Amino acid sequence: MQELQPIIEEAFERRADITPRNATPQVKDAVMAVIDLLDMGQLRVAERTDGQNWTTNQWVKKAVLLSFRLEDNAFIKGGYTNYYDKVPSKFADFNSKDFREGGFRVVPPAAARKGSYIGKNVVLMPSYVNIGAYVDEGTMVDTWATVGSCAQIGKNVHLSGGVGIGGVLEPVQANPTIIGDNCFIGARSEVVEGVIVEDNCVISMGVYIGQSTKIYDRETGEIHYGRVPAGSVVVSGNLPSKDGSYSLYCAVIVKKVDAKTLSKVGINELLRGI
């Protein structure tokens, strides 16, 4: 794996000149090796180092970007329809044995691109998982939810209907959006721009969080940016301006719960009485 990084780094510096016809076999093989490792979950765009801290493997993201320079659009059969794209489906060559061994469910017309990883006991309702994404075991990706490029989704997460988890291939220095273990993301919520939602959080319906979103803790008065602390229950809200003439959207941490409480208490109960 270490021998792949310098090949990717060097090729990325001249990516504007690379085409499917002039790319060297060495570059093609290195990029496809990275995509295959991502697809199997043996390599990740971001990795947890300790606690709630994550490290981004920027060179892996560069390999994903390079993959778009190496492929022409191609005809992709879809059974009841057809597609035309540079990246094949993760399941293009799957048979029933492959699905059984994968240990996950895929409900039509869910789509996952080659280079995404789907863990054991994951359920993909009609949803979309982009290249470089990692969906860990026991997670539900509900109807019309989107897992963006290189996003990292933890264990036993529920992404409710219409949820959007942002992708961050461009700009390449940006970190991926990360959802920690045992989180619940409510319907039609959006978490984007490399925001980290730490473990055991509950995000209510219709909450939008980007890097510039104020995340206000009503118990302490503290304002966070880009990170939702572990165990937070979050709803949408507003904060007034200093002169009181207007208010702007924010996300509000209304309470904190531990993993034990989260496992015993229903989501609706946590969101009642806030």
From Swiss-Prot:
One term under GO cellular component: cytoplasm
UniProt-annotated binding residues for substrate: R105, D142
Taxonomy, superkingdom: Bacteria
Pathway where this protein functions: Amino-acid biosynthesis; L-lysine biosynthesis via DAP pathway; LL-2,6-diaminopimelate from (S)-tetrahydrodipicolinate (succinylase route): step 1/3
GO function terms (MF aspect): 2,3,4,5-tetrahydropyridine-2,6-dicarboxylate N-succinyltransferase activity; nucleotidyltransferase activity
Pfam families (alphabetical): Hexapep_2, THDPS_N_2
Recorded catalytic activity of this chain's protein: (S)-2,3,4,5-tetrahydrodipicolinate + succinyl-CoA + H2O = (S)-2-succinylamino-6-oxoheptanedioate + CoA
InterPro entries for this protein: DapD_Trfase_Hexpep_rpt_fam, Hexapep, Hexapep_transf_CS, THP_succinylTrfase_dom1, THP_succinylTrfase_N_sf, Trimer_LpxA-like_sf
Keywords: Acyltransferase, Amino-acid biosynthesis, Cytoplasm, Diaminopimelate biosynthesis, Lysine biosynthesis, Repeat, Transferase
EC number: 2.3.1.117
GO biological process: diaminopimelate biosynthetic process; lysine biosynthetic process via diaminopimelate
Major subcellular location class: cytoplasm
Annotated localization: Cytoplasm
Enzyme superclass (EC): transferase
Family membership noted in the UniProt record: Belongs to the transferase hexapeptide repeat family.
HAMAP family given in the database record: DapD (MF_00811)
Record note on quaternary structure: Homotrimer.
Protein name: 2,3,4,5-tetrahydropyridine-2,6-dicarboxylate N-succinyltransferase
Name of encoding gene: dapD
